[in-house]
Amino acid sequence: MTSATDKSIDRLVVNAKTRRRNSSVGKIDLGDTVPGFAAMPESAASKNEAKKRMKALTGDSKKDSDLLWKVWFSYREMNYRHSWLTPFFILVCVYSAYFLSGNRTESNPLHMFVAISYQVDGTDSYAKGIKDLSFVFFYMIFFTFLREFLMDVVIRPFTVYLNVTSEHRQKRMLEQMYAIFYCGVSGPFGLYIMYHSDLWLFKTKPMYRTYPDITNPFLFKIFYLGQAAFWAQQACVLVLQLEKPRKDYKELVFHHIVTLLLIWSSYVFHFTKMGLAIYITMDVSDFFLSLSKTLNYLNSVFTPFVFGLFVFFWIYLRHVVNIRILWSVLTEFRHEGNYVLNFATQQYKCWISLPIVFVLIAALQLVNLYWLFLILRILYRLIWQGIQKDERSDSDSDESAENEESKEKCE
């Protein structure tokens, strides 16, 4: 069994030392992927701070206060090396307090953080309210833990097993393999919810026919708020600018702003069916993007094939489906379901919301079109020139970064 596994891995992997230097499918940085803390490059300042902490830890303790400082520095050093520790402690404390209390109802103050709120009595449907923000905030912490833990404890050892020796390339793989995991779960989850709704295969008329969708089923609400937490957590990392900005940093920021506005407005103003479809288009296409990049890092012979699949799903989901949704806003928005402004009954599908919905989705489409142009350029070079180069990423310096890394090791 072990030899069979090794042979299958050998088909995917060629030693990193013999990897072709002109390939950069793995360097395509599209708008939905933001690096985790584990994949951040270590700056000179952070290295100096680490040296100071280690020096403080090795010094003699003359007073009790020195011992306390050592404990604090020890924790900081551990947290710096394993950034999932702090969110892990927070999650353990909250979950333990919640489950040990024996009160799993909404009367428990911790319920709004751990579980979704506003269940409609006697049904599987849930309304919306301010407590949903607490759920999103708590699961932002959860996704911070999940991302850093998987990268540090699961994915990094796997990259070492695959003989990825370059630290720079290893960090790139951490990002993409986590994206494969997340999108590999969220994409099918979203499709499952869509299959059990009237939206299957991205039908547009049901998006408006049952409006307003003031309540949502259990799984639907978990998926929607979970996605909101995931995107909000990514936005926080992006705002902190913990890594060198990519060439398309402005487009990346714009993409996240538009996405967060779409998430908030679609949830508050009851356009969640439309939001579900857009979530799925992004997750499924991102899965194939990250898969093609990971295979490219491994110098796999399957890279061109998977990259071709990625291009197909990107065009179909992010352009064909999204443009169909845009067209439905112009043609079906007014005629399917109620079309009236009534604050008392939470009816917001009216002449005011129509242009807002259209502009937000169109803005997202413009960013995707810009990225499509760059993707097609890469595809053209891959087919006609055998070069897989991406000018829009921050990876112009990828090889130089690896060279600098080699020099540091030699020194």
UniProtKB/Swiss-Prot annotation:
Annotated TM spans: 82-102, 135-155, 177-197, 212-232, 252-272, 297-317, 356-376
Cytoplasmic compartment residues: 1-81, 156-176, 233-251, 318-355
SMART domains the UniProt entry points to: TLC
Keyword Glycoprotein: yes
InterPro entries: Lag1/Lac1-like, TLC-dom
Function: Component of the ceramide synthase complex required for C26-CoA-dependent ceramide synthesis. Redundant to LAC1. Facilitates ER-to-Golgi transport of GPI-anchored proteins. Involved in the aging process.
The name this protein goes by in its record: Sphingosine N-acyltransferase LAG1
Subcellular location: Endoplasmic reticulum membrane
EC number, UniProt record: 2.3.1.24
Primary location: endoplasmic reticulum
Species annotation: Saccharomyces cerevisiae (strain YJM789)
GO BP: ceramide biosynthetic process
Entry-listed glycosylation sites: N103
Positions of the TLC domain: 168-384
Superkingdom, taxonomy of origin: Eukaryota
Membrane topology category: Multi-pass membrane protein
